[in-house]
Amino acid sequence: MNLAVIGHPIAHSLSPQLHEQWLRASGLFGRYEAIDATPDQLPALFAAMREGDWDGFNVTIPYKEVVVRYLDDLDEAAKHAGAVNTVYKRDGRLIGTNTDGAGLVQALMPYTDFRGHVLIVGAGGAARGIVQALPTRDVTIVNRTVERAKALADTFGVVYTTFDEMDVSRYDVIIQTTSVGMDERSTPLSLEGLRQNTVVCDIIYRPLVTPMLQEAKSRGANIVTGVAMFVGQGALSFEKWTGVKPDETVGKKLIEGLLEE
């Protein structure tokens, strides 16, 4: 089985280690590569997949929207998310899906039943994929650009707020989807008033524990790192390609170990 992740740049990707571990554990012979592709190389890659050279692709930045033109169809998750992170074959056709949102929701299930209020921080592609996958519409969007928050909220029939009006004590689950925190110093919002046992998730996994998660933990929250979404979406992709449900616990330990090195 020949699998790969396509992006640019891609050297930082931990997907090969994760998926090759799952291939070995499942008794499947195969490989998973990281392909640093320029835009002009994309047509040949998808042509090769049609010809049987590849069994599946993950797609990452900056190609999640671009690859749509090379596919035969998108499933509902990809259509709603407006982006593709996984390509698989069915009856010779190339199908695009998006497992980011569903992967995160699945990873959060041990912590919440989603019966309370959910706050989504950010209004970009990641936020869109997560909102469409949530099993609730009791959702509030907050974003630095209010117009984008309103547009996303209107798309999914949820509400939006501003950082000035927001009260974090209202929410049972907070999901941070922006890049704020990658610098290991910044935090996207104030957690003043955060209730104990609130579930706080940051989809960033470098650093493993962001400044926001550090503060949330100090306030008694249940924190979930970006590894949860990374492994969750990867598991759903792996299952699409192989029909095998991989061990996410083992995958999570592997990735956390690599990030802590």
Swiss-Prot record:
The active site is at 64 (proton acceptor). It catalyses: shikimate + NADP(+) = 3-dehydroshikimate + NADPH + H(+). Pathway: Metabolic intermediate biosynthesis; chorismate biosynthesis; chorismate from D-erythrose 4-phosphate and phosphoenolpyruvate: step 4/7. One of its GO terms (biological process) is aromatic amino acid family biosynthetic process. Its EC number is 1.1.1.25. Keywords: Amino-acid biosynthesis, Aromatic amino acid biosynthesis, NADP, Oxidoreductase. One of its GO terms (molecular function) is NADP binding. Pfam families: SDH_C, Shikimate_DH, Shikimate_dh_N. It is an enzyme of class 1 (oxidoreductase). Gene3D superfamilies: Leucine Dehydrogenase, chain A, domain 1, NAD(P)-binding Rossmann-like Domain. Homodimer. The keyword Cell membrane does not apply. Involved in the biosynthesis of the chorismate, which leads to the biosynthesis of aromatic amino acids. Catalyzes the reversible NADPH linked reduction of 3-dehydroshikimate (DHSA) to yield shikimate (SA). This is Shikimate dehydrogenase (NADP(+)). NADP(+) binds at residues 76, 122-126, 143-148, 203, 226. InterPro entries: Aminoacid_DH-like_N_sf, NAD(P)-bd_dom_sf, SDH_C, Shikimate_DH, Shikimate_DH-bd_N, Shikimate_DH_fam, Shikm_DH/Glu-tRNA_Rdtase. Belongs to the shikimate dehydrogenase family. Shikimate binds at residues 13-15, 60, 85, 100, 205.
